[in-house]
Design a protein with these regions (language model features):
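Glycine-rich phosphate-binding loop used to anchor ATP phosphates in small-molecule kinases
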Residues: 57-101, 105
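Conserved phosphate-donor/acceptor-positioning beta-strand/loop module used by diverse small-molecule
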Residues: 101-121
Length: 173
């Protein structure tokens, strides 16, 4: 039997630092990094104008991503997915992917306060002006209304982190 890679994915509110952390983790683990933002921008340029558009197009790429990730894991390579696991349904999708692939997983929960996330979103707007229309406090509150913190009964391998962007990685097992 061949050795499967490990899948890493993230749970955290908008602005928690999932993309920043995922890049660092992929580099540290020498893993393949897949970014939902990059996939959506490549496949649906200029078509995502609202949160509803995001939900629609995100759902469209999932089947392709799932097969790609399973194929990469089958080679023994680790995969870091910069895709949100912010709801029970999203986390179930990741767990199902892992079950089908026969691989281990680790979910990093970036447990930041709303205030910390909003501060990082404000900084991101300055650094990436093209995101200013979407990276607003109003969108943060709209998206956060759907956020569901993970629970023990989900059977996830969770590492909780208080990573705050450039402040560094603080992990609580």
């Amino acid at each position: 039997m061949s050795v499967q890679g490990r899948l890493y994915f993230f749970c955290g509110k908008m602005g928690a630092g999932k993309s920043t952390y995922s890049k660092q983790l992929a580099a540290d683990q020498q893993a393949v990094l897949l970014s939902e933002d990059e996939w959506l921008a490549s496949h649906y340029p200029h078509q995502i104008k609202s949160f509803d558009d995001y939900l629609k197009y995100s759902a469209l790429i999932r089947p392709f991503i799932k097969q790609l990730v399973q194929n990469i894991l089958a080679t023994g390579a680790d995969v870091v997915m910069d895709f949100p696991a912010n709801t029970l349904r999203q986390r179930s999708w990741f767990l199902n992917l892992c079950r089908e692939a026969g691989c281990e997983h680790q979910m990093i929960w970036l447990d930041l306060t709303d205030e910390q996330c909003l501060k990082q979103i404000a900084q991101r707007r300055l650094e990436q002006p093209e995101r200013a229309a979407f990276d607003t406090e109003a969108v943060f509150h709209q998206v956060t209304a759907f956020f569901e913190p993970p629970t023990a009964d989900e059977h996830l391998n969770i590492v909780t982190s208080e990573f705050a962007g450039d402040a560094g990685i603080g992990v609580k097992e």
